[in-house]
């Protein structure tokens, strides 16, 4: 009789690739799933999973919360792999090195960053591979957002190409933060991704409905790039960049897919976005395009919302990198939540958080202490995206079956990255030979608990979370000494 290091016994195993949804034992040795059996297995450690779902660990394609504290909050929401793909990092070697030296609870990976490479060239920025120091600190400076000569574009593309050689998982393109750049530059970056066989991850520029003067409609730009370059284009947080125009945007994606292009999408189940308050599209004179006012915006960690345009201008000048809530849709209004739900239930859409770096109101960041103190704040999506998806879309609204919701949190994101990253093909699955990244949750009680006022309340109902066969969460308790996360590289 084979004895396994660990057996998860008698749980409801959901494997989205094979369609398995049945009571099984799962045997784990050395960080790898060795057996999925309808017969009882013998384990050195056996954990009774009766009445619980045993799922692949959730894979977040879009997290900016890449420190230890952010990982821990996401672990309690069922996540086992967090990837910084939309903003990316430049140089990626520095981002990977920092995570390796400090240790991480969850698996992690980075795309290279078009925006930060652009800042390096146009601002002369000495980049560190850290989102706060590089991108957020310089988000409001106009020099990096301007159109560039062909020579400069070639330099930027060359820098990104070298970063792909250092293991970057693709190219993050924050074109929505530099919305006047030449569309030809975007196509050059997409063409590089196509040559490398890796995806791009785009924060779209303005839709024509929101800015009739945009050089190109943000959704059209993404689908045309897929068609003309052959690149796999991933459309980030299609809910928050499309808002009430989501049907037109998803219609374009459907059409280009039918013609053979690869365009993938993601969404999160919240009505408020969050970004640096200095972002171009939050200029007071542009807010009306999204149906917003200064009062739609609130600074993370501050009481109340911004009262007027003059205050917004002052804040944008003095602290452009400060994180701001942007209340786009009222998620408690069913007719408005329906826009978000359409993005989440679109064919093969991934659930992804857009998790935000934690901020400590006292000033000094404290990413290693646990539990988080009352002065730690973030967007509730950082702590609650997956719990909320399972609560609202599966249990309450019934618009996704449980196996389909699991697929959107696991296999779909694994496959988005997996085309150019073979190690991702061992994730998002509960099969012999796959990584033992596993999430065990109670389908009847799993829920988000974070709110816009209590932003770091972790989800409930995620009973056990394993990364590489090691518990990061056990019996709903985070294990602060567990740092089994490994780098995911192309």
Locations of regions flagged by a protein language model:
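Metallo-beta-lactamase
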Residues: 57-64
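Histidine-rich, glycine-flanked metal-binding segment
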Residues: 1-56, 448
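Active-site beta-loop-alpha junctions enriched in small/polar residues
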Residues: 64-66, 87, 113-117, 176-178, ...
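Acidic, glycine-enriched loop/beta-strand segments at the rims
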Residues: 14-25, 330-332, 396-407, 414-456
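C-terminal cap of metal-dependent C-N hydrolases
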Residues: 341-350, 354-356, 361-373, 438-484
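Active-site neighborhoods of metal-dependent hydrolases
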Residues: 121-180, 223-227, 232, 236-402
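Divalent-metal coordination cores built from histidine and acidic residues
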Residues: 49, 53-54, 69-172, 261
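Divalent metal-coordination and catalytic microenvironments
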Residues: 11, 26, 31, 51, ...
